[in-house]
Amino acid sequence: MFADLDYDIEEDKLGIPTVPGKVTLQKDAQNLIGISIGGGAQYCPCLYIVQVFDNTPAALDGTVAAGDEITGVNGRSIKGKTKVEVAKMIQEVKGEVTIHYNKLQADPKQGMSLDIVLKKVKHRLVENMSSGTADALGLSRAILCNDGLVKRLEELERTAELYKGMTEHTKNLLRAFYELSQTHRAFGDVFSVIGVREPQPAASEAFVKFADAHRSIEKFGIRLLKTIKPMLTDLNTYLNKAIPDTRLTIKKYLDVKFEYLSYCLKVKEMDDEEYSCIALGEPLYRVSTGNYEYRLILRCRQEARARFSQMRKDVLEKMELLDQKHVQDIVFQLQRFVSTMSKYYNDCYAVLRDADVFPIEVDLAHTTLAYGPNQGGFTDGEDEEEEEEDGAAREVSKDARGATGPTDKGGSWCDS
């Protein structure tokens, strides 16, 4: 394509500087260094690295990256060669191979365009859609949309609801036990007063013993509250700190994942554009001027992928630790709860068993339960008050009649 031109096409570097260098890589057992190559004759004036594969000599060395231009292999220039020819040159070398390159000094912020931001929004929307809805709207779903970590996030939300329910139930239970302990304390005070005022020594001792039993139960209840209360603190720590921190980490991971998917989609679109122009036989400006825009997106995609991999690793580790803590913590808390409740009920049973003082014999007044013929019926204070009021009314009526005199046959009053 460029052979017909009488001049060289100037590269459009988009203001991105390059730094020359070289690196010697030791090939692996498959005679590979772990890079894929793009560009080259006849459509692009330069060859560049499209991708550096994981766990390969090039990736482990870390010198070259996606978007870097390859200028030579073992001191031999590759200008004007195709990517297939350059790949064969690298394969022909056994053992170590020296790659000459121009390092692309790209700033990832340059690749974060409005198009990438819109693609991130699209991926975020598609993430929460079903496959049928996405297909109906004509939205493509990336392969990482059905991410297992998203399901782990849903499980985390269910765990948070479980802990929230346990916390509320424990609070209500502790409140009920506190009120119950106050009731036992009131019982103890009442029976203690009765025992102190009881003149019969045996009955007094029985009432005091029964009062002490209720006061002991109140102490057992307070001890139960002090033992179970730290359980609320541990549950709240897990619910209000560990789970929100993990949830925030997963949200950061999703943001990085959507950014990586956006760059992948952008690379796919640019590849399709390039293939379409090649099929039509029309030169593409960015390709014929060094394809720097494409190489910038390749670099951004590689760095986004590195962040995505690291973030995914961190999230998986944090989720694993959180799951282990959940299993261990829930078992420990339930064991502490059950053992504390068991001890409380056993202690209460032992105290009440020792305080078996019934029936209690008490001395009542001799007239209280006397039903003989010489004894009148039992009257309480209200009946006595009513009798006194009736007697007073009769006295007043008698005095009134004596003062006014008798009545005549017609019922009218007459003077005496």
UniProtKB/Swiss-Prot annotation:
Residue intervals of the AH domain: 144-357
SMART domains documented for this protein: Arfaptin, PDZ
Biased composition (Basic and acidic residues): 391-401
Compartment list: Cytoplasm, Perinuclear region; Membrane; Postsynaptic density; Synapse, Synaptosome
Tissue: Ubiquitous.
Effect ascribed to mutating residue 46 to G: Decreased lipid membrane binding, but no effect on peptide ligand recognition
Phosphothreonine, modified sites: 82
Single biological process term from Gene Ontology: monoamine transport
Membrane as UniProt keyword: yes
Lipid group attachment sites (S-palmitoyl cysteine): 414
Region described as Disordered: spans on this chain: 373-416
Bias-annotated ranges (Acidic residues): 380-390
Any one GO cellular component localisation term in the record: cytoskeleton
Keyword Transmembrane annotated: no
PTM summary: Phosphorylation at Thr-82 appears to inhibit the interaction with AMPA receptors. Palmitoylation on Cys-414 is essential for long-term synaptic depression (LTD).
Protein residues bound to Zn(2+): 44, 46
UniProt xrefs under InterPro entries: AH/BAR_dom_sf, AH_dom, Arfaptin_fam, PDZ, PDZ_sf, PICK1_BAR
Name of one Pfam family that matches: Arfaptin
Membrane topology label: Peripheral membrane protein; Lipid-anchor
Top-level taxonomic group: Eukaryota
Free-text function comment from the UniProt entry: Probable adapter protein that bind to and organize the subcellular localization of a variety of membrane proteins containing some PDZ recognition sequence. Involved in the clustering of various receptors, possibly by acting at the receptor internalization level. Plays a role in synaptic plasticity by regulating the trafficking and internalization of AMPA receptors. May be regulated upon PRKCA activation. May regulate ASIC1/ASIC3 channel.
PANTHER family referenced in this protein's UniProt entry, alphabetically: ARFAPTIN-RELATED, PRKCA-BINDING PROTEIN
Domain remarks in the Swiss-Prot or TrEMBL record: The AH domain mediates binding to F-actin.
Protein's UniProt name: PRKCA-binding protein
Source species: Rattus norvegicus
Primary gene name: Pick1
